[in-house]
UniProtKB/Swiss-Prot annotation:
Gene name linked to the record: rplK
Designated name of the protein: Large ribosomal subunit protein uL11
GO molecular function: large ribosomal subunit rRNA binding; structural constituent of ribosome
Transmembrane segments: none
Self-association and partners: Part of the ribosomal stalk of the 50S ribosomal subunit. Interacts with L10 and the large rRNA to form the base of the stalk. L10 forms an elongated spine to which L12 dimers bind in a sequential fashion forming a multimeric L10(L12)X complex.
Pfam annotation, one family: Ribosomal_L11
NCBIfam families associated with the record: L11_bact
Keyword set includes Ribosomal protein: yes
GO cellular component, one term: cytosolic large ribosomal subunit
GO annotation terms (biological process): translation
Family label: Belongs to the universal ribosomal protein uL11 family.
PROSITE patterns, per the entry: RIBOSOMAL_L11 (PS00359)
Length: 142
């Protein structure tokens, strides 16, 4: 018999850096999850990833207070900032460009993001990434 899901909790946590402090502690504590157990599991699963990488995680909390979780690939904006070597996006992306990114780099990012975007072609993922890049104030080079 399958367990009944009580709630889903979506968080974004730096790889290998989960600890019981906010925002993790309060979000999981409300659901009655063993926070320390989650932190140990998450850190073990993400210990091979660079420590500054934000990892989206979806935690399924069951009625018996157990949990399971899946990790996703880092956000597109994280990959774009890394590729363009910038700290943050432009405050006025339409008029103020803060960097450039090549189509080659966009295709590399699309390949990294493809496991999370099931049912999408590499071309459509690339178009989505180009839209994100433009909204951050990056110009696209051929």
């Amino acid at each position: 018999m399958t367990k009944k899901i009580k709630a889903y909790v979506k968080l974004q946590i730096k790889a290998g850096s989960a600890n019981p402090s906010p925002p993790i502690g309060p979000a999981l504590g409300q659901q009655g999850v063993n926070i320390i157990e989650f932190c140990k599991s998450f850190n073990a699963k993400t210990n091979k990833i660079d420590k500054d990488t934000p990892i989206p995680v979806i935690i399924s909390v069951y009625n018996d207070r157990t949990f399971s979780f899946i990790t996703k690939t880092p956000p597109t904006a994280f990959f774009l900032k890394q590729a363009a070597n910038i700290k943050s996006g432009s405050d006025n992306p339409k008029n103020k460009k803060i960097g450039k990114i090549s189509i080659f780099k966009i295709n590399e990012i699309a390949k990294k993001k493809s496991p999370d975007m099931t049912g999408s072609t590499l071309n459509s993922i690339s178009k989505s990434i180009i839209g994100t890049a433009k909204s951050m104030g990056l110009s696209i080079e051929d």
